[in-house]
Every structure is written in C-alpha cells, then in structure tokens.
C-alpha cells in the first residue's frame, strides 16, 4: 500500500490546474504546491462552513454579533498549519469585502519553553509570521502554566490501600507547576496532568477574552492517537469530548470546541508545512526521545505506533480509529465530578478496583513473620496515622486514580483543588502595539530643546 504522501521526482503535470508541475501524490491525485495547499485549506473551510464565521450583513450581524475564535497554539506543525489557514482565510475575507472579516482571531500559547526544553520561544518567532497576514490583526498571547496553580487551594492528596482518595489543605506556599509535576511517579502521569492543565487554561482564557469558539490543531492522526492513549489511561468516558466537536460551559458562557483539521493526516500536515515554507516557524523540543519503550509516555508510544502504520502504507487506520471514536458517547448516569480533572464520574472507581485487585497481605503463619510484622508496626509514625485520620475524602475518577496510584512515600501528591488563580500573561502583542504608539509620542532630549 502507498504512503499517505509521496513526493514526486519525475516531471508530471498537476492534475488540478493542468499547468504547473506536480510535486506530491496526495490520496488519488498528483498536485502542484499551490493546488495542494488549496486542497488542505478547503478541508478546513468545510469544517468552518457555519454562517457565524462568514462576513455578515443585515440580520446576520444582529444574530451573531462579533465572533471571536481562540486558536490554541503549541508551535508544532499541526497548530502552525491551522494558524496559517485561518490567517489566509481572514486575509482573503478582508480583501474581498473591503476590510470586513467574519471573525476575530485570538491566538493563545501556553508557555512550555522550560518544561519541554523548546528550541525557541513563541514570542520571538511568531510575530514575523503574523506580519504575513497584514492588514489582518491577530492577537497573540503567551500564558504561564503557573496560572493554573492557586496557592490558596493547594491540597495534599493520598490514595488509601482501598483506593479511596484523601486530601488535606496545606498552608499557602509559593510553588510552580513544574515543581508539582516532579512529584509524579512517572512521565505518563505528568503528561496526563498537563493535559488537564492545558484544557482548563484554554477554556478560562477563552471566557476571559470573550471568545465563542475554541479551535485545536489536532489532525486525524492525533485524534486517533488520543483515543488509544485515553483508553490506556483509563479515561475512556471522555473520549467523545476529547475528539469530537462539542460545547463547554465555563463562567456561565457557552464555548464551542472544534477540531477543524480532523480530516487531515499527520503526513499531509507535514507536507503542507514543507510546501508552504513554514519550517522555520516550527517549535520543537530539544530533548531526544528515548528508544527504550519503558522510558516513553503513553502518548509517545501511540505516536510511534501510528508513525509505523504511515510508513508501511496503513495510514488509513487512523481514519478508522477516529471515526469509531466519534461514535462513542458518555454514559447517561452521573454520580459526581472528579475534583482533580473535572470529568464526570459514572461509577465509583474504588468499588470496582477492590473487586478486581488483591491488596491484603497473606496471612501470618509463623512466629518469624509475626515478629517482623510487629517490627513494621512499631516503625510506623503515630504522627502519620493521626495525619491520615484528619484527611477528608474527595471524589476522583478512575483515570486520576491510575495517575496518582504510583505516588510514593507519605508526602502524598500536591494539587490545587477547586481553585482559580489569576491568569498570568508572559507576552501579549496587543501590549507591544500600544507601546509602539506611546513611543511615538515620547520626546527625546533633542526634541525637547526648543529654540527661541
């Protein structure tokens, strides 16, 4: 079976425009650079066909008002392609309708420069890219991940042997998200908690910026990857919400969440980046991934799996997985919400875990075993026992139980519960524009000297 994208070396005419030389074989056609870029952009526009995103006149203006779309930008290939397509769409609307646009675009990046050891900062690279879409103005905001940490709501969380979660509030202390994640038992747990942070912060920024829609750059391959990863992590109940267009409510505001690149494979995304000459804007981690499976996260493993499928000509497997995942729905009965990730809990995970696991030790049968047991009991600190007795139970889902299950020692795991700290912006190009205007009105020493 052929790969999803094949770069052509022989001279052949594009099957679309019939004038330029074809450079890639995509799906069933051989296309030139311009036709391929137009083909990918058409896939996104198909997803954004709603009237609210078009240039509005008459009653439509009153019905939809000014639409604002938040684009979640990681700096990777998919989100970069999404930004380029939206930028070109706005530029086209601006030219065809004499300065009018169907919506305003707010780009938000969660700063992972230090966390993932990135090769560059968003605020240094992307202003140059945004300048390509003039006269369209696109807002670029870089948010600190520490915005998630509310020091007033920090709790120490422990899992009991019978899988119940206990928490106790701790004194407010200055701590960063990176420091909290260091307490995770493994990389997969840290990755899982980071996803919770990302989703929460993006929705909070969308509400604050008065955005009615949030768009993610997840392509079809990434969505299929997400389905497998969520299943492995015990978060199958949120698969539908994580991959399908849906509506979220935050601060009494309804926000539509969309995945416009859902019909495009990762190989096709990479081809777009190459042909549109966007490579210099791609932000990536400088940390080399381990070649040993046990040192990889769950998402790393599933990503490698789909890369192998693509390389061997089975890229369409991602389409099958993604379409199957779209058909999944959440159970109708809801007991409560998880106090860590906010997901609906449909059945008590501790009851189910107790039925399928054995946590009690074997019976003591010899005097030697009894002696060792008494020594163990004597080594337990009374302070620790009193501390555990003073903890309060909290509701957590099965996925969070798995994530926190490997926390070692009596220190527990520190996490903010039901808190909402102030959003901390590290960069806003709106502020940069305002500063430029102010600088134009600042008099220098020479300008201040007036001859009489």
UniProtKB/Swiss-Prot annotation:
Annotated pathway: tRNA modification; 5-methoxycarbonylmethyl-2-thiouridine-tRNA biosynthesis
GO CC term, one of those recorded: cytosol
The protein's name in its UniProt record: Cytoplasmic tRNA 2-thiolation protein 2
Ranges that cross the membrane: none
UniProt signal peptide: none
Chain's gene name: NCS2
Family listed: Belongs to the CTU2/NCS2 family.
Gene Ontology annotations of biological process type: filamentous growth; protein urmylation; tRNA thio-modification; tRNA wobble position uridine thiolation; tRNA wobble uridine modification
UniProt keyword list: Cytoplasm, tRNA processing
One function term, GO molecular function aspect: sulfurtransferase activity
General function of this protein: Plays a central role in 2-thiolation of mcm(5)S(2)U at tRNA wobble positions of tRNA(Lys), tRNA(Glu) and tRNA(Gln). May act by forming a heterodimer with NCS6 that ligates sulfur from thiocarboxylated URM1 onto the uridine of tRNAs at wobble position. Prior mcm(5) tRNA modification by the elongator complex is required for 2-thiolation. May also be involved in protein urmylation.
Intracellular or extracellular location(s): Cytoplasm
């Amino acid at each position: 079976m052929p790969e999803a994208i094949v770069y052509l070396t022989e001279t052949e005419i594009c099957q679309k425009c019939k004038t330029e030389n074809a450079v890639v074989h995509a799906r069933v056609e051989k296309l030139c650079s311009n036709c391929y870029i137009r083909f990918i952009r058409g896939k996104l526009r198909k997803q954004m066909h709603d009237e609210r995103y078009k240039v509005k006149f008459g009653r439509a203006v009153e019905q939809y008002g000014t639409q604002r779309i938040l684009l979640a930008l990681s700096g990777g290939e998919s989100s970069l392609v999404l930004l380029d397509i939206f930028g070109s769409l706005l530029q086209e609307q601006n030219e065809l309708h004499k300065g009018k646009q169907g919506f305003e675009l707010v780009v938000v990046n969660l700063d992972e420069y230090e966390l993932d050891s990135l090769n560059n900062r968003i605020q240094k690279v992307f202003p140059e890219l945004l300048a390509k879409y003039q006269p369209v103005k696109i807002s670029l905001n870089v948010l600190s991940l520490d915005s998630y940490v509310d020091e007033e709501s920090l709790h120490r969380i422990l899992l009991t042997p019978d899988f119940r979660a206990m928490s106790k509030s701790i004194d407010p202390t200055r701590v960063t998200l990176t420091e909290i994640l260091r307490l995770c038992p493994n990389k997969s747990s840290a990755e899982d908690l980071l996803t919770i942070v990302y989703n929460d912060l993006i929705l909070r920024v969308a509400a604050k910026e008065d955005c009615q829609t949030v768009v993610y750059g997840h392509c079809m391959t990434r969505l299929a990857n997400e389905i497998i990863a969520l299943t492995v992590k015990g978060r199958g109940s949120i698969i539908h919400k994580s991959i399908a267009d849906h509506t979220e409510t935050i601060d009494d505001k309804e926000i539509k969440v969309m995945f416009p690149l859902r019909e495009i494979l990762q190989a096709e995304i990479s081809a777009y980046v190459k042909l549109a000459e966007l490579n210099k804007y791609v932000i990536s981690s400088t940390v080399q991934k381990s070649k040993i499976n046990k040192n990889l996260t769950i998402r790393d493993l599933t990503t490698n799996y789909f890369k192998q499928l693509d390389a061997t000509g089975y890229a369409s497997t991602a389409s099958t997985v993604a379409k199957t995942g779209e058909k999944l729905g959440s159970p109708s009965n809801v007991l409560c919400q998880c106090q860590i990730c906010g997901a609906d809990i449909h059945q008590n995970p501790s009851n189910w875990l107790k039925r399928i696991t054995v946590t009690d030790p074997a019976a003591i049968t010899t005097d030697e075993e009894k002696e060792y047991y008494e020594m163990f009991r004597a080594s337990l600190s009374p302070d620790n026992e009193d501390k555990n007795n003073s903890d309060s139970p909290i509701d957590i889902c099965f996925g969070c139980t798995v994530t926190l299950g490997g926390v070692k020692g009596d220190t527990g795991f520190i996490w903010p519960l039901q808190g909402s700290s102030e959003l901390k912006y590290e960069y806003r190009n709106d502020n940069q524009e305002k500063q430029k205007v102010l600088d134009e009105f600042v008099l220098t020493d020479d300008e201040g000297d007036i001859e009489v």
